[in-house]
């Protein structure tokens, strides 16, 4: 593992109501992150400058679950993992704000508007290799 992946970020998942359970929010501190601002890597590997773009790349794939995998976890297992989806909110630091309502989620987004972002895309590169990573993007 390189020295690039030393940062931590905090993701707040915005989990919509499923008809049985009300809308809820899940906080998770993601370790082993690299934060890149103003550039994006395209699928073909080329680098492109994109003003205001932010990409979090994490090697913490051990704690990552796809949206479906996360939804299928038993309730007592969900705190051990994170997922990432469009409209989730990422703070570019480890924070401990508690969010339980839509209003608190909006307040969190306002509080960290200069040090956070709403997710617009997620790329998973998990193949059981040392280079495995998940990219969480705002573009």
Language-model features, listed with the residues they occupy:
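N-terminal intrinsically disordered, low-complexity, charge/repeat-rich segments that act as generic
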Residues: 1-20, 38-39
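Short, conserved turn/kink motifs that form compact alpha/beta structural patches or helix kinks used as
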Residues: 23-139
């Amino acid at each position: 593992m390189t020295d690039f992946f030393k940062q931590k970020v905090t993701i707040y998942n915005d989990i919509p109501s499923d008809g049985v359970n009300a809308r809820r929010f899940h906080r998770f501190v993601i370790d082993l992150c690299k934060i890149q601002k103003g550039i994006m890597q395209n699928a073909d590997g080329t680098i492109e400058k994109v003003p205001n773009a932010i990409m979090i790349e994490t090697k913490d794939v051990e704690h990552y679950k796809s949206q479906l995998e996360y939804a299928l976890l038993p309730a007592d297992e969900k705190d051990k993992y994170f997922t990432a989806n469009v409209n989730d909110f990422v703070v570019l630091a480890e924070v401990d704000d508690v969010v339980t309502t839509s209003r608190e989620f909006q307040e969190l987004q306002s509080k960290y508007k200069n040090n956070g972002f709403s997710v617009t895309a997620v790329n998973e590169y998990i193949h059981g290799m040392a280079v495995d990573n998940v990219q969480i993007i705002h573009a």
